[in-house]
Amino acid sequence: DKFAINEKGGYLYVLPTSNTGSQPVNSLHVLDKDMNEVGVINEIARGESIYAARFVGKYVYFITYRQTDPLFVADISNPTAPKLLGELEVSGFSEYLHMWDDTHVLGIGYGDSQQSKIKLTMFDVSDPTKPVEVNQKLIDSSESWSNEFVYNYKAILADPEKNLIGFTAN
């Protein structure tokens, strides 16, 4: 995911999925200006892969995918001691996360592993230890659709002021 890397306050934050063993494993690494690791969270969602991430303020929100499809919230306010705060398992998976407002994250992806339904999800993250799926919308998809939002986040319109969400689908 192109949003799984972020620079803030002289630190580089990276959310890689490693496939070196029998199962993928995820982690959060914090590097200083000399590229020394100063903070880490290891062993996040073993057997799954990170599909979407968004760094906002002192938090990083990310979605993994395989058997279960959780939204994770991690606190990165202290670069030397990042903490995993909350997790919410939901059906489907998001390919893109967008901060809707101070307390809501919009997820755009699929409602099932066959990608037969596009899924819009609104997460309430006002309590980062207990994220909640407050709304979802499933839209029928088909093999002939070209869901550009999966590869190009610029194909998504998310306008909280006008309460609009749009994306391309051919």
Predicted regions mapped to residue ranges:
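Feature marking well-ordered beta-strand scaffolds used for ligand recognition
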Residues: 1-170
